Amino acid sequence: MSDGGKTKTTVEIYGQSYTIIGQETKMHMRHVASIVDDKMREINEKNPYLDINKLAVLTAVNVVHDYLKLKEQYEKLEIQLKEKE
């Protein structure tokens, strides 16, 4: 459903349904939700005794860590490209 450039979709993350509204496509939002779900399940396999809140926070920390590593790699590549110009 698109309303004023916004898309609404329902996704399932770790057994819970969430309605998400954003400017990206439904496919993109579902892909993001799938990655979050996969990451939560991966962390839960290693730490099965975490409650849902701690699992969610640990997942967020891990995802931001991965994001920052990729951002750093991207910035290094940008510098290398500029040096070659």
From Swiss-Prot:
One cellular-component annotation, GO: cell division site
Key words of the record: Cell cycle, Cell division, Coiled coil, Cytoplasm, Septation
SUPFAM superfamilies assigned to the protein according to its UniProt record, in alphabetical order: Cell division protein ZapA-like (SSF102829)
UniProt key word Cytoplasm: yes
Coiled-coil stretches: 60-85
Compartments reported by the entry: Cytoplasm
Functional note: Activator of cell division through the inhibition of FtsZ GTPase activity, therefore promoting FtsZ assembly into bundles of protofilaments necessary for the formation of the division Z ring. It is recruited early at mid-cell but it is not essential for cell division.
Subunit structure: Homodimer. Interacts with FtsZ.
Family of the protein in this entry: Belongs to the ZapA family. Type 2 subfamily.
NCBIfam families according to UniProt: PRK14126.1
Protein name: Cell division protein ZapA
Organism of provenance: Bacillus pumilus (strain SAFR-032)
Lineage, highest ranks first: Bacteria, Bacillati, Bacillota, Bacilli, Bacillales
